[in-house]
Structures are given as structure tokens and as C-alpha cells.
Amino acid sequence: MKFVDEATIRVEAGNGGSGCVSFRREKYVPDGGPDGGDGGDGGSVYLQADENLNTLITYQFERFHNAERGKNGRGRDCTGHGGEDLVLKVPVGTRAVDAETEETLGDLTTHGQKMLVAKGGFHGLGNTRFKSSTNRAPRQKTLGTDGEVRSLRLELMLLADVGLLGMPNAGKSTFIRSVSKAKPKVADYPFTTLVPNLGVVNPRPGQSFVIADIPGLIEGAADGAGLGVQFLKHLERCRVLLHILDIEPIDGSNPVDSARAIVGELEKHSPKLAGKPRWLVINKADLMLEEELQEKIDKVVEELAWDGEVFTISAYNREGTAELALKLLDFIDTLPPEEEVDVEAEVEFKWDNYHQNANESVNEDYDDDLDDDDYDDDDYDVEVIYQR
């Protein structure tokens, strides 16, 4: 199935049902009181993470999604049926962004996690709600409110502990093949990897971590060169980044310039991503003599002013890859657990105080219509004449 990591959809929650104005009509009860029921709440729209999905391709073709409208209230104090909620299944790791305001609504990072993205409209109130000692035959009701309407941009970001960075043909796919059972395509031309790949690494029995390989970056990627930086978002949830550097490029380019270009593109795209722990991994060590190799590595580290971890491997021959995997596992274990955010608790909607405001408004309007000079005991009873 085609890998699609971004889609724009429009979600519309159901409108609330309106309240009803109704009075009891029974034999031997000539002046029945109000019995208009409330409407039903409109259905809301939720996103739910599903570990069985791995692409957003469905939402490229199904862009409009509507929840059910609440039913109107009816006589005899019958409340309208609430609209059914709409639950949209998305892959684990999906982020929801409001396409109009660019506000991030939340991330779905665990299987079964739900997030409210469009709240259904509130139900309207029937005239039974407005009866009082001075208003025995109310003819007021409130309408149901409109449901939330949003344009959402869904962004799928892979969940991985370790992310791979590097120029095309630096050996990223070969490395992930050497430490896991993932089998991404490997060839002797640039941009062999066109979509992100995941692999599970098991350095010790019962202990593992996930590693992500993304297409190679080139200078100018932040401005759209090559495949651009559209796949860098998949590294945002990684705990540590491995900068894979080809020590002996086939085109004769300078490894230092390549490394600086990658760091520059990273900082342009996201300072937060550039600030993550980053290890330098010198690859293709088997292409040079040991004496020349160490001399060149020292020169690269010095020119880059690199003060972090440095590892030398040959992904093709699997030299040094097992030791690097163990180091990564131990480092990840020392990192603090990531905090989980309750995305639903932070969402605010504009209709939260609708009913309270509606009641206050009706009561104020009714009180203003009362005239103290004309007020007498007969005003406590209201005669209602029904005509068929």
C-alpha cells in the first residue's frame, strides 16, 4: 500500500436539536401546562489511534466527514435523540493540526487513544424549562447550536527511538539492514530510499528499540531541493539522532562539507530537532586503510568541532554495528520517560456556557415586561385558550 503521511480533511460535528413549545392536551384538563421537551445533542467527531493502520491514504480520497445531527424535542416532555458520534481511525503517531489557525490539537501516540476534534452542538431547551410562578404558560424555547466545523491537517509521524540522518548514499539503509530485520531497498545511486522505513533492534534478549530511516538530505533541502525536508518530521519523536557520514564519498566530495550541510538544514527546519542528542557515525570504514582512516576521522572531528559521541562502523560488513546498538540501548534507558498530555482536557469550545446564558437572557427579558402597577393576585394564574 502507498505510504501517505499527510492528508487534509474537513470534519463537521452534528448540530444540536431544537427545543419544543408544547402544552398538555388531555381530557378534563382544559389548561394543561407546558410539556415541550429538549432537543438532543449533536454528535461529536473524534480521532482514534489504531495500531493496525500505517498510512493516511484513506483520507486522501474521503475528505468530508459529518457526525449525526441531534433530533428536535417533542411534546409530552420527549427529549430528542442525541446524534451519534463519528470516530475516525488513524495510525498511531498521527498529529492533528487546525489547517486554518495552524494550532496543534494533539498527538495520538498510543493504541486506542481518542481525541475530540469537533464538538457536537448543544441541545435547545423546551418551554418546560422556562415555567415559573410568574410565567405559567411559557412560549419560549432555544434552538440547538451549530456543531464545530474544522479543516484538519493530519500528519503521520513515525514513532521511533533512534533516527538516521545523512546525505544520499551515506549508508543509512545498509545500517538499518545490519542491525534489524528490516529490508529497505539498497542500491548504488542516490535517493534509493523514497519513504521512511522502520526497524526493530534487539541488542539484548527482551530489550529492543525502534530505529527510523528517512530519505537522504542534500544542501538546500529546506528550500525544497531533492526530496525536501518533508520527512524530517518523522524524526521529531526520536530520542537520539545518528548522523551517518560517508568517510569516502564516491563523488570525491568533502565529508566535512556534507556534515555541515546536514546540520544547517536541520537547524533551518527545526531548532528543537537540531537540539536533540546527536551522535556522529563514520561509515564505510572498510574502504580505507586503518592508518589513513584514523587520520581522516581526526581531521573531520576537528574541523566540525564535534564534542559529542563518535563511532566508526562498516554497515556493509557489520563491523561495529552491534556495539553501537548496545550503546544506543543503554543511552535510551538513561533518558527520562516522555510526559503524556491529556489532549482532550485542553480543548475549549465556544458553546460551553450557551444554556446558562440562554436562561439568563429569557428571565431578564421576561422581568423587564412586568409592570408593577398592573400586578395583582390574578397574575399568578394564566388562562390558556386552546383552539383546534
UniProtKB/Swiss-Prot annotation:
Family annotation (PROSITE patterns): G_OBG, GTP1_OBG, OBG
Domain OBG-type G as annotated: residue spans: 160-333
Keywords: Cytoplasm, GTP-binding, Hydrolase, Magnesium, Metal-binding, Nucleotide-binding
Composition skew (Acidic residues), residue ranges: 362-377
Subcellular location: Cytoplasm
GO molecular function: GTP binding; GTPase activity; magnesium ion binding
Binding partners and assembly: Monomer.
Protein name: GTPase Obg
Gene name of this polypeptide: obg
